[in-house]
Amino acid sequence: MTNSIDLKQLEKRAFRSTYQDGLWDIYYGLITMFLAIFMDRPEEGYSWVNIALMVAGFLLAYVLFRGAKKLITLPRLGQVTFGPIRKARKRTMSIILGVFIALQALLLVFTFLGWLIPQIGKLISQIFPGSNDLLAVSLIGAMIICVSMTVSAHYSDFLRGYYIALLMAVAVFLILFLDRPIYPLIIGVVIVIPGIVLLVRFIRQHPLPSSEENHE
């Protein structure tokens, strides 16, 4: 029984070690900054270019993240294989996140359409009468981000994910409600900086193995 508990604790520590490189922090910080830049509402109104640029920014952040994992983390830690319980948690997390991502996408599209198409804007005003429509959309967007990121942090044992979830929720609210990208940009930088510090420390603590060690 003790050995079983010890193995679970070792696996948990090994799973958490995948976050010690700080790359997830950098990735989420970049996502927040791209949101702040490309969701800023211009005076002349939104265009589909805003959406295209935002999606391109997300893809760039993901490519940088995967590339850094492959070129920096994998050569130093190797490929880690986890047990069935941990794999089941990852599958559950993927399903839950898939649902929340779909909700986020729907909210994002609905919000953009409301700004682009007057008829849909009127529909939003009917659903949220008065001057509270923007406040309601902003709160819903922030709540979806906060809940989805918190669920992700729980199932992945990513402890820093809890405060990142809170910061990203605040950033989304400020983006939608105040339309001042400087505040979410600052929040994105606040998320990225600890990630860079962790990445530098990770590289120093885990130098690349020499060619002799690889042959052994």
What do these predicted regions represent?
Residues 178-193:
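Loop-to-transmembrane alpha-helix initiation sites
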Residues 160-173, 186:
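Central hydrophobic cores of alpha-helical transmembrane segments
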